[in-house]
C-alpha cells in the first residue's frame, strides 16, 4: 500500500534537488511533448503531478491562452513551479491529491508526466478522471512500467524477501486492461532506457534527490550489513564494467474519452 503522506513528505524534501537528478523524467517530458505539437488550442487544461514544472513549461508554451490548472500533492513542488513559470490570470496552482480532487469544471486536456506510478488503484484513477474530462477530451501521460528498477527489486528479494523499497510498477498490458469503454486508446508506446551508476548508494541518492524514495507504508530501514549485502548482490548480477545498471521502463499513452 502506498502511503500518500509519505509521498507528500518525500517529494517536499526532494523539491530543491529534483531538477538536478530528474534526467529520466525530463526525457519523458520531451517525448510526451512531441505528442502535443499538433494539438489545437483548447479552453481548460489540467496537469497532474506538475512537480517543479518540467512539463508545465511545455504546456504553457503550446497553450499560452488556455486556462491551465497545475496540480501536485506537494506544496513545495507547487511553489517551485509557480516560481518558475510565474503567476498569470489564466494559471491556477492547486495543492491536492488527484484521487481526492473534485473540480467544478470539466477539462479538454489532461496531462501527466511521470506521476501515475504513485497511484495504487489505476482503474479508480481513470474512472475518476472520466468524471471531469469533457466528451471527446484527451488524456496524455507518461509513467513508469513494470521493469523499472527490476534489478533493485530482485537484489532486495535475494537478500531478504521481506525487504521492499520499490513499489510494483504496472505493465502496458495491465494498464490497457484497467481502461474500460469510457476511453479509446489513440496511442501507446514503451521504451527501456538503461542508466549506469558507480554504486548502489549513488543510485539511491538519485532516487532520494527526486523525492521518489519508497512510499510503501511497510518499508523497513536498512541495516549496514543488509546494505553491504545489497551492493554485493546487485554487482553480482547487474554490473557493467565498474558500474551498476539500472533499467527505466517508460510508458506513453494518449486516451480519448468516448462520447
Swiss-Prot record:
EC class (word): transferase
Name assigned to this protein: Malonyl-[acyl-carrier protein] O-methyltransferase 2
UniProt keyword annotations, A-Z: Biotin biosynthesis, Methyltransferase, Plasmid, S-adenosyl-L-methionine, Transferase
NCBIfam families: BioC (TIGR02072)
Signal peptide: none
Family under the similarity heading: Belongs to the methyltransferase superfamily.
CDD domains for the chain: AdoMet_MTases
Keyword S-adenosyl-L-methionine listed: yes
HAMAP family attached to this UniProt entry: BioC (MF_00835)
Gene Ontology process terms (BP): biotin biosynthetic process; methylation
Catalytic activity: malonyl-[ACP] + S-adenosyl-L-methionine = malonyl-[ACP] methyl ester + S-adenosyl-L-homocysteine
InterPro entries according to UniProt: BioC, SAM-dependent_MTases_sf
Transmembrane segment boundaries: none
Function: Converts the free carboxyl group of a malonyl-thioester to its methyl ester by transfer of a methyl group from S-adenosyl-L-methionine (SAM). It allows to synthesize pimeloyl-ACP via the fatty acid synthetic pathway.
Annotated metabolic or biological route of this protein: Cofactor biosynthesis; biotin biosynthesis
Highest taxon of the lineage: Bacteria
PANTHER family: TRANS-ACONITATE 2-METHYLTRANSFERASE-RELATED (PTHR43861)
One Pfam entry name: Methyltransf_23
EC number(s) recorded for this UniProt protein: 2.1.1.197
Amino acid at each position: 500500500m502506498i502511503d500518500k503522506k509519505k509521498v507528500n513528505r518525500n517529494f517536499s524534501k526532494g523539491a530543491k534537488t529534483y531538477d538536478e537528478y530528474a534526467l529520466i523524467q525530463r526525457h519523458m517530458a520531451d517525448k510526451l511533448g512531441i505528442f502535443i505539437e499538433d494539438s489545437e488550442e483548447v479552453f481548460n487544461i489540467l496537469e497532474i503531478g506538475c512537480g517543479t514544472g518540467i512539463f508545465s513549461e511545455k504546456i504553457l508554451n503550446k497553450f499560452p491562452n488556455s486556462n491551465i490548472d497545475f496540480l501536485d500533492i506537494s506544496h513545495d513542488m507547487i511553489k517551485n513551479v509557480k516560481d518558475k513559470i510565474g503567476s498569470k490570470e489564466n494559471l491556477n496552482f492547486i495543492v491536492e491529491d488527484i484521487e481526492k480532487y473534485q473540480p467544478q469544471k470539466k477539462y479538454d486536456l489532461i496531462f501527466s508526466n511521470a506521476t501515475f506510478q504513485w497511484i495504487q488503484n489505476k482503474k479508480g484513477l481513470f474512472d475518476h478522471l472520466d468524471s471531469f474530462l469533457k466528451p471527446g477530451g484527451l488524456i496524455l501521460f507518461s509513467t513508469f512500467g513494470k521493469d523499472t528498477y527490476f534489478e533493485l527489486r530482485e537484489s532486495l528479494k535475494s537478500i531478504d524477501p521481506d525487504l521492499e523499497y520499490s513499489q510494483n510498477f504496472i505493465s502496458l498490458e495491465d494498464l490497457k486492461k484497467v481502461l474500460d469503454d469510457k476511453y479509446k486508446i489513440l496511442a501507446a508506446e514503451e521504451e527501456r532506457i538503461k542508466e549506469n551508476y558507480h554504486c548502489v548508494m549513488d543510485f539511491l541518492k538519485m532516487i532520494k534527490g527526486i523525492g521518489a524514495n519508497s512510499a510503501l507504508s511497510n518499508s523497513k530501514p536498512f541495516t549496514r550489513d543488509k546494505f553491504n549485502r545489497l551492493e554485493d548482490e546487485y554487482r553480482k548480477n547487474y554490473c557493467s564494467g565498474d558500474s551498476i545498471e539500472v533499467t527505466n521502463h517508460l510508458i506513453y499513452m494518449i486516451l480519448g474519452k468516448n462520447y
